[in-house]
Amino acid sequence: MRRFILYLALCVAALLQPWQRVAAQEYEALDYRDFKFYKEEDNDISLWAGLNDSLITEPQTRSYTPNSRYALSYATSRYRGEPLSESRSLFGNTVVDYTTLRTLKALGYATNEQNGISRAQLSGSTNQTTAILSGAESRLYERQSLYADLSGRNYLIGINHRGVYSIDKYGVPLKEGWMIMDYARVRTGRDLYVEGVFTNAVDIAVGASYNGRNDKLDIAISLPWSQRGLRQASTEEAYTLTHNKLYNPTWGMQNGKVRNSRVATSLRPEVIAMWQRRVTAVTDLTLTANAYFERRGASTLSWFDAPTAAPDNYKYMPSYYSDDERVIVERAWSTNDLHYTQIDWDRLYLTNSVQQDGAARYAVTLRRSNISHIAINAGLKSRVGIVTLNYGAELGGDSEREFRVMDDLLGATHIRDIDYYIMDDASYSHLTDNNLRNPNNIVNEGDRYGYDYRLSRIGLKLYATAEWSLSNFDFAVGAQMMPELIWRRGYFEKELFAGKASFGRSQSITLTPAMINASCRYSIDNHNISATLMLGANTPDADDLFMQPQYNNRIVNTPELATTISSEITYSYTAKRFRATAAIYLNSTTREIDVVRYYDDLAGEYSDAVVSGIGRIRYGIEATARASWSRYFSSSFALNLAQYRYHRNPTVNIFTDNDNILIAKTISAMRGHHIGAPEISLYGDICFRHNGWMARASVQYWALSYVTPSVMRRTERVLSYTASNEETEALRFQQRLPDAATIDIALSKYFTLTEETSLGIQFTARNILGSNVVYSAYEENRISLRRVGSRTDVTPFANRLSYAYPRLFSLSVSLRF
């Protein structure tokens, strides 16, 4: 009865207070407007997974501590300028993704984070490796916790419960035995700051851990589901006219209610298990298996032989017009006329209703991804004298089926499954069918249309590491290689590429990525110095190995591995009241490949551009420190000074999408341009702790951040069309984003209610200065061609960016028992 009353009291208290935790729910599209190709870039982890919901009050002495990493996430502050995919997590010897890591942490597993490459022999990461601890090291202990929050950011209400239960042998707790874990979380409601953003999500996970004398077993099963209305980047012109830095162009009013055209859904059942056994006195066996099937969907507003419905399209902005027309459009935007600034759902329904054939001109479509993954790893760990060997093999495969589904015809009866972009093309207008295998090309709601294909990969990874110690020196080396096959299978036969050119299995691509890593460490007294070098060859993304995977089996002409050279030197000092770490790092990549699918304004064609020979370099200095000034006061600091740049000019081969004829071979002037992450970031805080109270104030600062550059607009081909130096410089120019600083404060108190029960309350205020911080920004691939007399002006499209949330307040409550 007591526990029930505590549950009820906490729920009531939490629902009366606002609280926020999760990072900005951004949706960064490369180019969402009236283009034939639309590629989602889900690089922001916050799109697909929430952050850890535990109270973070204890700074840790590592490069970029949880406090500083969380605070600096207010802007897109990539660690060492790397993509998030470079952060790896290990469960045993198997690399798992962020969702799996989040599940195991939610179930109570402890983790050990190692920044940089000093412990990347198995993960291959140039960023950060997180080891998920198992068995006795997992630090599982019996407890339960209940957590509820009222949040105005991304969602409104959230409740979760987690529990760890021991199964005691003979009725008494023992070091050996079973631990059972469960975790459940529910979030629902709309964002109070950004219109159209909402979340409905349920996470469920159960697990079991057995710790025996010679055996250890860990198994977890999870089922996260989510549905989220998303936010999308726009132009500075739109933000200025609407007087709203959180302007979101993806929604509009329908029947008096807000409707978002971009809704992401995800369902992912997963199981992961690891068994460890001591087979001899010096050898341990570890078997790991991981499998999941993820069903993703992302809706978008589509148009068929009709003008774009995107409200912030450049053709609908005041800057597109002149004289009287400009004044009218500017007035509509500045007065927030929803018929101009947002999607006009009523107009779309009306347009569909007057079509004599009943066919839709506008519809909401769903891009679906069914992703399956399986990995089976067998590893041995042997101790031979002073040397510890870790070696094994992993068989793994991934399959991603991509297709489009008609979600809502907006009052119409059907569409035809044809390529609307070549209907008026003199050469290809008779080859419009998207699927010759379906003679009846009528598409109703719920039908697949447009494209349907699968990308598959299978590989066998072989790995080995060795570690040994000599006096004050530690040495480690590691190597791995993974021969793999990649192929495409088309389920639609597109008329443009009839037969095996689009239908059935493509030729297989055979690649063998590999990595070697060597490190040494010297320790004496309170000082520790380490040096690490890593060389790697990595496989490109599967969709960058095909010209147009949606409906074409053609492989790019030169599929090759990207090469990586990474090194770092780290120094750390540990004393009773002071800890510090400093690192010098370098990461250089070459021979990267990317396929850009876009509308080429010079050719007037939808095109596939194969960009090869991309080279990037990232180097810098980072440092962290923690000082205990007294019994009650402490501080932590983090600093990163870096350069993130392109160091090579890539080759660009541009092909027509309709027939893969080479339009141009050119070079892009990318050398010297910035990659697009803050190159200076600072964090500092001061914290007070006493008798269950904690108060902390922190300052964050970002500088030298640039808009992510476009390769296509800097090609020699585009620059040759300019009529003046001013036009050339405008295309070459890379915008620097404003430097930003924020101040956060946090206040928490833990109450001990009984011997086994405690209550925690934490108040936080983020960005109390109310600073306008650019969260992320990127350049468009398209250019504008305008005829002025006898000349043609060539200008770039406006950059697209999104802003972080303004001043935010939150209150969280947690109960442990």
What is the role of each PLM region?
Residues 4, 25-33, 701-720, 747-817:
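C-terminal beta-signal and adjacent terminal beta-strands/loops
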Residues 58-60, 94-169, 176-177:
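A beta-strand signature from Gram-negative outer-membrane beta-barrel systems
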Residues 155-231, 263-281:
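Transmembrane beta-barrel wall of Gram-negative outer-membrane proteins
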Residues 217-274, 297-365, 428-443, 595-597:
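Acidic/polar loop-and-plug regions of large Gram-negative outer-membrane beta-barrel proteins
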Residues 234, 438-442, 485-496, 522-567, ...:
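Surface-exposed extracellular loop regions of Gram-negative outer-membrane beta-barrel proteins
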Residues 247-270, 274, 506-515, 519, ...:
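Outer-membrane beta-barrel signature, preferentially recognizing the C-terminal barrel domain
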Residues 363, 388-524, 549:
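Signature of Gram-negative outer-membrane beta-barrel scaffolds
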Residues 469-472, 584-588, 606-713, 816:
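Gram-negative outer-membrane beta-barrel transporters
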